[in-house]
């Protein structure tokens, strides 16, 4: 099935809970029974969302290996001239899922039917917990419109467990103080979710998850322990990373790991940027239709009816 479309239904396996820490390997790449094995390496696909170019790594597929996440998009990098029209995704609904946005450079403007209106800056993290349903609009930030510059970031969706899918929606922007930065001789990292090497994010999620942005220095050798019952995947932004079984991860590629072992072993000769994510898979069925991610087809139909009847808000008002 194409990664351009969400699947209509898929079971996800369950798992237990643990927080990882980091160890530094004493040599280069090596194999070990304790290292996670590779399930698959995928090339992200180029698409357009509104007027924004993206690279899509997955969208509703491979859930047995990426849950609790359901979508991974890299947007940009795109250089914007001062005074140019904003890169924009017009008002659209969500339900049963938490779209999150993180900017490596530039800024974004989020406006929604909950009366939130945010400018999200570089290094900040936004969570749009859509719950039973809400509408939002996204575009490049005001500073980029006024001064020009580069926009580059990631929109990654977290699936919402069944117990919380019909909660009231809410939007939150998290500043630097919520996400610790790690600086050492091997890498510079941001702990957006979860815990790494004793540094812990204060951001709460419905189910245990980790989300690390890592800038690897030259000849960085890392062995990152994770819960062997949790999913894990890694996306390469720039540079290249040597991983298990003599494979090399290149820009716009994502590696999905198997469960059963905990350690993620990697090495970068010339340096690299990667996102490493994962967490406890949900033991629940998934029915999805575009921006709606629910547990039954009946719930999907209710989402469509709620949107069409205006219960999620007025898209014309959000677009203003």
Give, region by region, the residue ranges found by the protein language model:
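C-terminal segment of N-terminal export signals and the immediately downstream linker at the start
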Residues: 1, 21-42, 320
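N-terminal export signals
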Residues: 5-26
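A short glycine-rich, His/Asp/Glu-containing loop-to-beta-strand
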Residues: 45-101, 182-223
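Glycine- and acidic-residue-biased ligand/ion/polar-headgroup-sensing regions
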Residues: 95-109, 132, 227-245, 250-251
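Short acidic-glycine-tyrosine-enriched beta hairpin
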Residues: 114-129, 243-264
